[in-house]
From Swiss-Prot:
GO cellular component, one term: cytosol
Family: Belongs to the bacterial glucokinase family.
Keywords: ATP-binding, Cytoplasm, Glycolysis, Kinase, Nucleotide-binding, Transferase
Species: Erwinia tasmaniensis (strain DSM 17950 / CFBP 7177 / CIP 109463 / NCPPB 4357 / Et1/99)
GO annotation, biological process: glycolytic process
Protein name: Glucokinase
Encoding gene, per UniProt annotation: glk
Keyword Cytoplasm: yes
Main localization of the protein described in the UniProt heading: cytoplasm
GO molecular function, one term: ATP binding
Reaction(s) the record says it catalyses: D-glucose + ATP = D-glucose 6-phosphate + ADP + H(+)
């Protein structure tokens, strides 16, 4: 008889739940819930389990916030809960709550070539460290290492490191944003709002008045080539995305590859392919030859968070990935 576990990927707007086959990691019966329709994560889980009528005793939920203790408070929603209390309330034998990019990193060993698009480099070295990052509402970062036949995710808040300007143009951008924001993190550039920040800073650095644009406006005008400032912003976004990925590669020697997740890049994929992304990734001065063979992949799987939550849980239960 097939045994299932509950897996989830929860953000500020949507909570996506699914079943994961414990033996092989297959994800099925995924369903997306609006977080605005429920008072708590537990209420969403109960609604889902009531529909599926499965005997579930194990769960793993990925959430877009730091996970440091039993008590979890979402940063982009008002849900807060005790993991141990939720586990008891649901009568689960185990319940894991992990960071969303911990889940994405754990998906890497489960991905097939059909769910990856390569941008330069050669082939990934087996069992070598991996880096994962992605721009969306924020900038998520994680690393993955292989130790004693187990994959270990190294989560953190790498999206909040300082933005490092590396050209005269970027110096001007940093000057404008520092005046507005004080501390300028990488996430202030590499995110949906970051794209708007880039556009605004480009215009203001030229002593002009920017329009009140949304991220989608900047992207659409850039792709339609109807706004030079928007096109410059999107081009700079791709370059800085490459440079940031190259920094991650240097940090841990990620010869297992650097993987891009998140919802922004697929919206302008052809533009991204033709951009200065890969050149910026390799632009490491004396260490250009070091990073040159490291492959970069865009994850195209529909549910990497669910896949990774399942992988994390299965490994916790003793399965070898």
């Amino acid at each position: 008889m097939t045994k299932y576990a509950l897996v989830g990927d929860v953000g500020g707007t949507n909570a996506r739940l699914a079943l994961c086959e414990i033996d092989n990691g297959a994800i099925s019966q995924a369903k997306t819930f609006s977080t605005a329709d429920y008072d708590s994560l537990e209420a969403v889980i109960r609604a889902y389990l009531a529909e599926k009528q499965q005997d579930i005793k194990h769960g793993c939920i990925a959430i877009a916030c730091p996970i440091t203790d039993d008590w979890v408070e979402m940063t982009n929603h008002d849900w807060a809960f005790s993991t141990s209390s939720m586990k008891a309330n649901l009568a689960f034998d185990s319940l894991e709550i992990i960071n969303d990019f911990t889940a994405v990193s754990m998906a890497i060993p489960m991905l097939s070539e059909e769910h990856l698009m390569q941008f330069g480099g050669t082939t990934p070295a087996e069992d070598k460290p991996v880096a994962v990052y992605g721009a969306g509402t924020g900038l998520g970062v994680a690393h993955l290492v292989h130790v004693d036949k187990r994959w270990v995710s190294l989560p953190g808040e790498g999206g909040h490191v300082d933005f490092a300007a590396n050209s005269e143009e970027e110096d001007l951008i940093l000057e404008v944003l520092r005046e507005e924001l004080g501390h300028v993190s990488a996430e202030r550039i590499l995110s949906g709002n970051g794209l708007v920040n880039l556009y605004r800073a480009i215009v203001k650095s030229d002593h002009r008045q920017p329009e009140d644009l949304k991220p989608r406006d900047v992207t659409e005008r850039a792709l339609q080539d109807t706004c030079t400032d928007c096109r410059r912003a999107l081009s700079m976004f791709c370059v800085i995305m490459g440079r940031f990925g190259g920094n991650l590669a240097l940090n841990l020697g990620t010869f297992g590859g650097v993987y891009i997740a998140g919802g922004i890049v697929p919206r302008f994929l052809e533009f991204f392919k033709a951009s200065g992304f890969r050149a910026a990734f390799e632009d490491k001065g004396r260490f250009k030859d070091y990073v040159a063979p490291i492959p970069v992949y865009l994850i195209t799987h529909d549910y990497p968070g669910l896949l990774g939550s399942g992988a994390h849980l299965r490994q916790t239960l003793g399965r070898v990935l």
